[in-house]
Regions:
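An N-terminal assembly and electron-transfer interface module characteristic of large anaerobic redox
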Residues: 1-213
Length: 213
């Protein structure tokens, strides 16, 4: 991601911007999405940092990478850019907010149990299962084939989905040991959460038998 970002973004841009744009362009270059049926969306705050300039940087990167047909949507209340053909409806914004909250829940559950798991890899496996279920429920208005196979319920509206995630992680077999030292990860928001950007600092913390928070 960093190498792709440096290739398509001038290196006077900040590190988080290079990382994010590299990720987005990489996803297209690797063939994970059809460039003729894909749009990229990014927030635009109206401030002076990358949060306003992402729009132009991403558009230029896509053109330079050979994908000028991919539209870039600026999600903003400032009205700096026009987004013809796109309308942020209340229903869409509601789904976006749900995705943000559930993503935070999944991360917190994973970090809380992974240092104590009985079977190595079991927490990551459970996380990936619920990540798939969440994606399906958001795309199909609460319905999930994976959830049907995993917990016997094919329909999970928002509140039950939350409860099922917590219940599932609570049931994961853990070692009967005292809670380990907790280490807080702080700093620039993107670098704090993106493993490649922070050199997998959470893995380093957990490798020293500590719990990342």
């Amino acid at each position: 991601d960093v190498e792709t970002g440096l290739k398509y973004v001038n290196n006077d841009a900040c590190y988080p911007a290079i990382m994010v744009i590299g990720q987005l362009v990489d996803a297209i270059l690797e063939g994970r999405y059809d460039p003729d049926h894909t749009a990229l969306a990014i927030t635009q705050t109206g401030g002076m940092c990358r949060a306003t300039n992402y729009f132009g940087l991403i558009r230029k990167a896509l053109v330079d990478a050979g994908y000028p047909q991919i539209p870039v949507i600026a999600i903003s209340t400032q009205g700096i850019e026009d987004n013809p053909g796109f309308k942020a409806t209340p229903a869409l914004l509601h789904r976006v907010i749900k995705a943000l909250i559930i993503g935070d829940l999944l991360m917190k559950c994973l970090y809380r149990v992974r240092p104590y798991e009985v079977t190595p890899g079991s927490a990551n496996k459970l996380y990936k299962t619920w990540d798939t279920i969440v994606r399906e429920t958001l795309e199909h208005h609460g319905h999930s084939k994976t959830a049907k196979r995993f917990i016997g319920k094919g329909y999970l509206p928002y509140p039950p989905l939350f409860r099922q995630i917590v219940t599932s992680f609570d049931a994961l077999p853990l070692r009967n040991i005292p809670r380990t030292l907790r280490v807080g990860v702080v700093g620039e928001i993107l670098v704090s959460y993106q493993p490649d950007a922070n050199n997998h600092v959470v893995d380093v913390i957990e490798s020293h038998d500590c719990e990342a928070v």
